Amino acid sequence: MDAPARLLAPLLLLCAQQLRGTRAMNDIGDYVGSNLEISWLPNLDGLIAGYARNFRPGIGGPPVNVALALEVASIDHISEANMEYTMTVFLHQSWRDSRLSYNHTNETLGLDSRFVDKLWLPDTFIVNAKSAWFHDVTVENKLIRLQPDGVILYSIRITSTVACDMDLAKYPMDEQECMLDLESYGYSSEDIVYYWSESQEHIHGLDKLQLAQFTITSYRFTTELMNFKSAGQFPRLSLHFHLRRNRGVYIIQSYMPSVLLVAMSWVSFWISQAAVPARVSLGITTVLTMTTLMVSARSSLPRASAIKALDVYFWICYVFVFAALVEYAFAHFNADYRKKQKAKVKVSRPRAEMDVRNAIVLFSLSAAGVTQELAISRRQRRVPGNLMGSYRSVGVETGETKKEGAARSGGQGGIRARLRPIDADTIDIYARAVFPAAFAAVNVIYWAAYAM
């Protein structure tokens, strides 16, 4: 019994060592993502032992040089109302930490994202971000690679909503410049120095992006040193990218409907003046539709004090639509005024003819030798009062009455000639040519001022 017991003890010890080795292999497999030889692996526990992650590499010495690089995955949304855009990027940071160097091999070690919590990391943040979050499906989207000389590559995937100041004076024919500013939150230029990676000549993925409302025309990188009186100088890296708005969708949704509404208001110039309900309803409908179009277009824009190019065009169209309605009111007023004048002429013409006939009879009697007293007595007895006035006005005119009558007729005739109403049909004929020509001229000036 003693001999089997002595053999069983070493066997159990061997099994325990084998199990421990298997677990160690599994743990290493969590850190190494490839089929590599295990013999070259550094002793991670030895590297981490005594490692102070709260202090930067080389504390008390020269600053840490951190290289940054960006890859743009998508630009999801650009909002003019909130002056912001949403971007998903891969942020790559690289620096050297001599405390983690292992020079007995030339292999780069790929580590699990859980190892990140044991390392010192630059406190990089997005200066103009309104909100941001990391991705964690199916695991945390973080990458860490360790080179033998202690150089660390740290990559994370971030989605951030970033502020972008926009000048909308030429909207929707505007071009905007948005920025992504990266800076250290707590380390000044004495502790950390940022610079764009040498491989960052262009941004991978940005050239292939297809945006709904914009086209990315160009981008550039800048480096500057921000000076804060209370905290010192902080290095800042900025990505500037220029956006040109796609005008096609606005021409279809805003400009073409406005032009069609203006052209629709001109239809009233070909409708008869007698069709009052048709012309009035057409004019009011175009005015209200233009108002609705203006309100709906402004709903997606900020309430800014600047007048935008689209607002200018809407008001141009609104003035032409309203002017077409006013044109009909003016033409209808002239037509109604002419009708009243004709009615007055028809009523006064028979009365004037009767006065002339009575005056001729009285003049004939006077020429035949009838005495003035007899003529006066007969006129007083037989001739009505209006005939007396007519006779005096025709037959007994002195020089003064002629002069006064000529002066009155000359003054009133000149005013009436200047204020004589124009025929309504003539107004419509002029409007058919003047309105389209004026609208075309205004369009040429507008597009030359804003589009070129």
UniProtKB/Swiss-Prot annotation:
Disulfide bonds join C164-C178. Residues 1-24 form the signal peptide. PROSITE patterns: NEUROTR_ION_CHANNEL. Glycans are attached at N103, N106. InterPro entries: GABAA/Glycine_rcpt, GABAAd_rcpt, Neur_chan_lig-bd, Neur_chan_lig-bd_sf, Neur_channel, Neuro-gated_channel_TM_sf, Neuro_actylchol_rec, Neurotrans-gated_channel_TM. Pfam families: Neur_chan_LBD, Neur_chan_memb. Changing E177A: In GEFSP5; reduced receptor current amplitudes. It is a multi-pass membrane protein. GO terms for molecular function: chloride channel activity; GABA-A receptor activity; transmitter-gated monoatomic ion channel activity involved in regulation of postsynaptic membrane potential. GO terms for biological process: chloride transmembrane transport; gamma-aminobutyric acid signaling pathway; signal transduction; synaptic transmission, GABAergic. Keywords: Cell membrane, Chloride, Chloride channel, Disease variant, Disulfide bond, Epilepsy, Glycoprotein, Ion channel, Ion transport, Membrane, Phosphoprotein, Signal, Transmembrane, Transmembrane helix, Transport. It catalyses: chloride(in) = chloride(out). The modification Phosphoserine is found at S390. It is found in: Cell membrane. It comes from the Eukaryota. Residues 272-275, 332-426 are cytoplasmic. The chain crosses the membrane at residues 252-271, 276-298, 309-331, 427-449. Delta subunit of the heteropentameric ligand-gated chloride channel gated by gamma-aminobutyric acid (GABA), a major inhibitory neurotransmitter in the brain. GABA-gated chloride channels, also named GABA(A) receptors (GABAAR), consist of five subunits arranged around a central pore and contain GABA active binding site(s) located at the alpha and beta subunit interface(s). When activated by GABA, GABAARs selectively allow the flow of chloride anions across the cell membrane down their electrochemical gradient. Belongs to the ligand-gated ion channel (TC 1.A.9) family. Gamma-aminobutyric acid receptor (TC 1.A.9.5) subfamily. GABRD sub-subfamily. Heteropentamer, formed by a combination of alpha (GABRA1-6), beta (GABRB1-3), gamma (GABRG1-3), delta (GABRD), epsilon (GABRE), rho (GABRR1-3), pi (GABRP) and theta (GABRQ) chains, each subunit exhibiting distinct physiological and pharmacological properties. It is linked to Generalized epilepsy with febrile seizures plus 5: A rare autosomal dominant, familial condition with incomplete penetrance and large intrafamilial variability. Patients display febrile seizures persisting sometimes beyond the age of 6 years and/or a variety of afebrile seizure types. This disease combines febrile seizures, generalized seizures often precipitated by fever at age 6 years or more, and partial seizures, with a variable degree of severity. This is Gamma-aminobutyric acid receptor subunit delta. It comes from Homo sapiens (Human). The gene is GABRD.
